[in-house]
Amino acid sequence: MSNFKKSPVIFDEAAHTYTLEGARLSGVTAIVKWMFPDTYKDIPQSVLEKAAEHGSLIHKKCEQYDNCGFGDDLQEVREYVRLKAENGLTTLENEYLVDDGKDIASSIDVVFDKDESGMYSLADIKTTSKIHKDNVTLQLSIYAYLFERCNKGKKVGRLFVIWLPKEQYGKAELMELKRIGSADCKKIVKAYVAKEDATPYREKYFGGVEASTEIELIEESMPANLKDAEDEIIKIETQLKQMEERKKELKEGLYDLMVQHNVKKWQSKRLQII
């Protein structure tokens, strides 16, 4: 358990809203969308909603594992555990709520314990089919600014995106990102609150063109009906594999019984084993 400051902001998980003394605050993801409005513009809403549901499940499972030591029944969570272990990262907080006291608030996915330099690391979990580095760099940099504002004297050293994709889109990876300074983050937040045009800020801090990993965006470019078909096929293939394994186990069990009782042939109306 950490000794971080507890935010007075009230987070409504169902409505995904942040409220401070009756006033509604914006989330950091809204600032990211303002800065990069075209990231998901061509993706059907149904695909985005399905991806969001999957992402929420993985987030909750990772948090469950950190807090209770179980929940690693999914491959993505096992990869999360592996990445933490391989990089010597210890979770202090999940979904740690931070705010600027007036306009914005958000929950940081993971806060890791201090490193050798005495600074904390922040991480955001992504389950998308590829990583939009500029988007998550902005997101985590604002998180770092808010974290340090809420916890005077405590410093953030490293920012990580924990990429936990479905198996067909690549291997899970821990990516370190370069931080945008707090002074610049304050300027960006101020411009967002004032409803300024994001273009000058996007050009200044990101060169006007979004950078991403080289992973092909297969999932997001698929029409919803094809994506649904793909998911169903993968589900069926998994079930078939499981049933074949179970069939093998049962037949081996029957064969062992036949040997024990000196039965050379088993035959019924539905099954024959020799």
Name these PLM-found stretches.
Residues M1-A105, D113, E252:
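Metal-dependent nuclease catalytic cores that hydrolyze phosphodiester bonds in DNA/RNA
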Residues Q45, E49, D134, E220-P223, ...:
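Short, solvent-exposed segments of well-ordered alpha helices
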Residues I58-H59, Y143, I236:
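A residue-level signal for conserved active-site and pocket-lining positions in enzyme catalytic cores
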Residues D72, Y96-V193:
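Nucleic-acid nuclease catalytic cores
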